[in-house]
Amino acid sequence: MKPIVIEARNIVTRLGENLIHDSISCTIRENEIYALLGGSGSGKSTFLREMIMLETPQSGSIHIFGKDIADLSLTEAQELRKQWGVLFQSGALYSSLTVGENITLLYKEYTDLPPALIHELVKLKIDLVGLPTHAIHLYPSQLSGGMIKRAALARALALDPKLLFLDEPTSGLDPLSSRQFDALIQQLRDLLGLTVVMVTHDLDTIHHTVDRFALLGEKRVIAQGTLKEVLAINHPIVDYFFQKESHGIQG
Ligand SMILES: Nc1ncnc2c1ncn2[C@@H]1O[C@H](COP(=O)(O)OP(=O)(O)OP(=O)(O)O)[C@@H](O)[C@H]1O
Ligand SMILES: [Mg+2]
């Protein structure tokens, strides 16, 4: 078995009065495309935000690359952050900057590379995610939804991370663009040896792109594993997602 990249154990999260996670655990291994699936409000984004150190659970532990993320010095935390890229749900590009400038910003913030080299790297990343070369000069408002996702992905990949976090990468995209984006994620995983963690509602993504996933519900992990393993579990939430919804998709 491949080495473990992320190990979350017994995570308990309270936000205000709300108990969001009541002891959730999951194990994500190198080179996997791993998804967090669950109904709206089941705490998927919150869990993702805890993994990337934007929020802190009340108890439990998260180890990434073997390090307990609750137990890092500032320098260690900064070093660890450089090893992952994040694609937020909205894309979160700066609207006043071009695609090229959006990506450049990251290199300026985290590296001392000379401008000419940064420019070459930006062009490479834009090419890597399948955007046309001229996209470097475009503003986010001039891009389609699919192109915005790709531009945000190019930025997430700027520092050559080994780990990629995606929050609802195909939401808002039409079915064809969604499948193309899924295919891109798989290609990049293979090409760059990435480990990918994504929050998704997209059952096509679960069926065709994801290796394993955790189904969140009732504040817990209802099921975890490959699609086949999860489907073998007898639980109303599993039925809800995979019988009702697949029935709906087939019309
Ligand atoms: N700052 C906060 N204070 C209190 N409650 C919050 C806060 N942020 C989120 N919540 C609540 O936490 C729960 C989980 O939110 P989260 O965004 O993680 O869900 P989600 O599974 O990502 O949902 P969606 O699929 O709609 O994106 C929700 O009930 C939400 O209302
Ligand atoms: Mg969410």
What kind of region is each of these model predictions?
Residues 164-167:
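Catalytic Walker B motif of ABC-type/P-loop ATPase nucleotide-binding domains
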Residues 52:
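Helix-to-loop junction immediately C-terminal to a conserved catalytic motif
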Residues 139-143, 147:
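Conserved ABC ATPase signature
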